Amino acid sequence: MNTMTMYKLKKELSPEQREELLRTLKARFKNNMNRYKGLEWAKLQAKLEAKTEKLWSLNEMERTGGEPDVVDHDKKTGEYIFYDCSAESPKGRRNVCYDREGQEAREKKGVHPEGNAIDMAATMGVELLTEEQYRELQKIGNFDTKTSSWVKTPSDIRKLGGAIFADRRYDHIFVYHNSAPSFYGVRGFRGSLRV
């Protein structure tokens, strides 16, 4: 079964899955208090329990190796902001082209990636991190020191066939370009979700 087929799941968690996910998120929250200041688990949990479709998306982030964690709270909207916080680009989302156009270009050449970042993110109900969000993420830890992650590409770059990705090397954040049809075993994507 390819990765895209795996994503065509019912977008609802069983009570057992919901409890397991909440336990995982609570443990991660407690173990990474340095990522956020002034947030309380009880308020976050109440918000999560009221948004079952968002729990499903968080579960998809978790299931594919993203280790989602809350990184901020938008005081204007009241939303909590989650990013994939796995040390390396999520394992269940690697070997993907940037978007469907890139994937189709590869497949015409007889090469079959695991899918594409844009469609996978949409199916999961998340957004790719922007370059700015990626840089914010890197302020709370060292991520992608051995891998890289596609980031949301500006339309003017994408129109010309390119896409951008980022990583951390030599204690610096690098943003690079590549053709959208490219895919690698060490490149995936990181998502963001507002709850």
Residue spans for each PLM region:
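A binding-site-centric feature that preferentially detects glycan-recognition modules on secreted/surface proteins
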Residues: 2-127, 131-195
